Amino acid sequence: MLGLKLREEFSGRRIKGTMIEMHNRNGTGALDKSASEFLKITYPSIDMLKTVEAVQAGRAEPVVIIGARGQGKSHLMAALSHMHQDKDATVNWLNDWSARLKNPDIAGLKLQYGMHVITESLHLQRYKHVWDVLFDQHPHGNIIKAKWEVHGTEVPGYDLILEMAENKPFILILDEFQTWFEGLTNSNQYKRKTWAFNFIQILSEISEKHPELLTLVVSVREGNSDAAQQLFRVNPVRIDFKGPEAKRDRQRL
């Protein structure tokens, strides 16, 4: 037996839904738990292992996770967030599953420990712009925000975000990007969709050219959406929950 445990939302008499919350007021969200507690309910699926491999130290690449609601994208992203913040719990989890599955390659995975981790569920609409997430949650965010306001450009530029990453390298995990992006509109005065498009390109390019400074992980529902297509310009690693490998993996599980 693998010793897997159901997530709490599936163990009660009523199931509220399959989308997990990163944080909530009750302190029971995925990121409110300790890393060791959350990883106990995390199985090293093919999707999970491919994602961890893609963001490994020394070879990290931008990652786009594609899948419909309820397929496990948010759980994967929460696990990734925990892994980058708790090395001991992550190494123990990798070693444990390496032994259980008799797969030494799992124990050999090495993440970029020490990076600042920013994880945001964009569909909750806590921020108007993606750069507001960085200004609020990155240690150097306030300084970069002040510099940008002096520049007066519509979108924080490449050099400013690179400076932020050089001050403190970070991994940016954006869940439900497509849901958020499709809700944006352009007007004569506020071209929010265009601004979002331009800024995500800046993040993608920095993540591609300087993976040691910025690792970008984004989830979308559909690979043919406008939200996904703009991310595909830098040829990221695609984790497709609808793919045949993922389907076989779930059947085995």
Regions of interest found by a model, annotated:
Residues P62-V64, V117, P169-I171:
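Residue-level preference for the first positions of well-ordered beta-strands
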Residues G27-K33, Y113-E154, E176-Y190:
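Conserved P-loop NTPase mechanochemical-coupling segment
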Residues A30-M48, K73-L76, H123-L134, V150-E154, ...:
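Phosphate/oxyanion-binding active-site loops and adjacent basic polyanion-contact surfaces
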Residues N26-G27, E53, R59, D88-K102, ...:
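Phosphate-handling catalytic cores of nucleic-acid transaction enzymes
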Residues S81-H116, I144-P156, W195:
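Flexible phosphate/Mg2+-sensing switch loops adjacent to catalytic phosphate-binding sites
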Residues M1-Q71, A78, H82-H84, Q229-L253:
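Walker A/P-loop-proximal flanking segment of P-loop NTPase domains
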Residues P104-L124, K128, I202-L253:
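Conserved P-loop NTPase catalytic core
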Residues G141-Q178, L184-T185, T194-I206, H210:
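Mid-core helix/loop region of P-loop NTP-binding domains shared across ATPases and GTPases
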